[in-house]
Amino acid sequence: MKIKDFNIECDNLKIEENEFSKGSFAKVYKGSYYGNPVCVKVIKKDTLIDKESWVFLKREIGILKNLLNQGHKNIIRFIGIGEKDSLLFLVTELINGGDLGNILLDHKFHIPWSLRVKIAKDIAEGMEYLHSKQIMHRDLKSNNLLLGRNWTIKICDFGFAKEITIQNPLSMTICGTDEFMSPEVILGIQYSYSADIYSFGMVLLELITRSKLDERLPQNNFDIDYEELQNKIPSECPREFLELSMKCCNYDPNDRPSFTDIVQTLDQLAIKLVKETPDGPYPSTPIVVSNPHFDDQSINDWCMLSLIPDDCLENLNEFAEIENNINNNNNNNNNNNNKNNINNNNNNNNNNNNNNNNNNNCKVICENCASPQSTSSVNSSFSNSSLGSNGSNSSGTSTSSGGKKRSQKRKSWKCLIN
């Protein structure tokens, strides 16, 4: 089976050695095309062993090409596809901020409510654009939302996306990621655009709670456990924000708002928050500078190592000098303490803190790149989502063609906002 229009000249495509993401059929690398930084998804043809795999791949390429004609600020930009020997190369723009899911789980990053609303609006505007082009994403989740400069969200991964036609307005394929899938998708019921809206509602709940979503196992017919959720909602959460998330997560698809309605609601909420609780300028995208000697990294490590906005790159040399001065001072203090055998508790505490800082592999730099502060291991902060049943694969997504009966035990979401 052939894929036409291979418009990437592979001789001018350079790929770094270490992968930073791995899925069922592909590995993702950082690379360059004619010297410009790009993201490269490398697919071995022999992994596409069945017709369904080719269908999903060709559909993803077709959708990305169609979106390229006009483009949208909240959709990943497609550059092209190439072929060489047994490999296919899917090339997109490189987004250095990592994915939203990992950022939300790391609580050392302060994300004010006005910024959370802005993030939600970015996602909604991108999804509104997709739906206006008759495209369902079908795998909307926080890990498929990349963080660009100035906290701009880019929707990515269109492997399960599908164009909706008048002749075929509904779908029955069970695909996506368990924690974000709507009940009608999991149960094998016909669904349409409203399934994406449910997934968006689950992303909003992650924005609100800044915690992992619990797997919706057989209880509740895959509806939300509202009693458990209530314990995770911060008291300062804007009522309208929580109410919107609950409307998007309505069990009945007909009761969910459209993305056009969602954008309007978030616009109004953003204006209200600025008037009532101005947060000032949004914080800069966090920067993490790695130890220069690192081996092959997982996707979560790499995303953290590459959180470097353009406007802060010029300060990295200054930071390195500051860090060297700190290390030299620490070594001098330690030598003086050893020579004089001073038994001062305060000095010992300071030395211990300094030694801990020296032993860290990473440093988080504040907004002006001038005051490094230590952080714990990247791996301890960012862990992969646990896989659900229902045929989940290594990328946390699942696909199936049949539904399963589930016991039903539902509670009203209104208990959360009354």
Swiss-Prot record:
The active site is at residue 139. One of its GO terms (cellular component) is cytoplasm. CDD domains: STKc_MAP3K-like. Residues 327-356, 377-418 are annotated as: Disordered. It catalyses: L-seryl-[protein] + ATP = O-phospho-L-seryl-[protein] + ADP + H(+); L-threonyl-[protein] + ATP = O-phospho-L-threonyl-[protein] + ADP + H(+). Its EC number is 2.7.11.1. The keyword Kinase applies. Residues 14-271 form the Protein kinase domain. The keyword Transferase applies. Residues 377-402 have a biased composition (Low complexity). InterPro entries: Actin_reg-Ser/Thr_kinase, Kinase-like_dom_sf, Prot_kinase_dom, Ser-Thr/Tyr_kinase_cat_dom, Ser/Thr_kinase_AS. This is Probable serine/threonine-protein kinase DDB_G0280461. PROSITE patterns: PROTEIN_KINASE_DOM, PROTEIN_KINASE_ST. Residues 403-418 have a biased composition (Basic residues). One of its GO terms (biological process) is signal transduction. Pfam families: Pkinase (PF00069). PANTHER family: CENTER DIVIDER, ISOFORM A (PTHR46485:SF5), LIM DOMAIN KINASE 1 (PTHR46485). One of its GO terms (molecular function) is ATP binding. Keywords: ATP-binding, Kinase, Nucleotide-binding, Serine/threonine-protein kinase, Transferase. Belongs to the protein kinase superfamily. TKL Ser/Thr protein kinase family. ATP binds at residues 20-28, 41. It comes from Dictyostelium discoideum (Social amoeba).
